Amino acid sequence: MEKLCKGDKIALIAPSAQIGGISKIQKGLDFLQSLGFEPVFAPHLYNVHRYMAGTDKERAEDVNWAFSQPEIKAVFCVRAAAGAARILPYIDYELVKQNPKPLIGFCDNAALMLALNKKSDTISWNGFLPTYDFREDTLNPLVESSLRQLISNMPQKIISGSTLRVGKTEGTFLCSNLSVLMKLAGTPYFPDLRGKILLIEDVHERLHKIDLMLQQLKQQPYFKELQGIIFGHFTDCSGDEEDGTLDDCFADFLYETDFPCIKDFEFGHTPARYVLPLGANAKFDADKTCLEIISY
């Protein structure tokens, strides 16, 4: 993928929840302009339909519009929260495939990222979201530095986390919020797990729900052909005493599997996180807790 350059036009879309006005994205907008980009607002960016930024078809139209415009070099989601999975039947996946460009977002936006990767073989950047990352006055240095790496098409070699099971592997890298991922189960948009290295995280979930979602993941087609699992941060996830611990959930999930695995990788709903290319080719060394992005 070609690196982005100063002067490039970028689309701003809201495929999930409503924005709530220009003030909510102004700091993020200023940051993107400081990088030299020229933001272009999607036609329905400020629309409102219930909790979402317009109807399903309106939000899908904005995605299709962004990928259809040759002058647009990247597509930035401005908010997540909920709703992206609803637009997936209305995306023109062949259009996206013929006009590849990075989609950048986080959290609920991963539903769209996973669908585009599955249906259009595209690469998205997961981990940056203007409304989320500029709740404070400044962007976290790790988010900013890793985003700049992707913008410049620089290689990523990350040491993070702790080992749960040793091993080395290569595969296609995917990353998602666990709840968002499992909402796609049983749909045409759930990823083909064969040959994949999967990073998952979550926030504000009860431990018994984390446990059940992990077991649901374990029952998906081709799970046994997964190459590796990386657990990111599970922020503010708690439970009752009988629920056990998060490590108990991980241990039950890993039972009767043999792929390499690490936990506490710097990705999730915390101020500091890496921005990572979903769909890239990667090497994973659990012995050294190293994720190396080979190409994207």
Where does each model-flagged region fall?
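ATP/NTP phosphate-donor binding region
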Residues: 1-71
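Short acidic/histidine-rich motifs immediately flanking catalytic phosphotransfer sites
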Residues: 69-74, 225-226
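N-terminal glycine-rich "phosphate-gripper" loop used for MgATP/nucleotide binding
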Residues: 74-85
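Short, acidic/small-residue loops that bind anionic groups at enzyme active sites
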Residues: 91-115, 123-129, 257-261
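Short internal beta-strands
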Residues: 41-43, 105, 226-233, 262
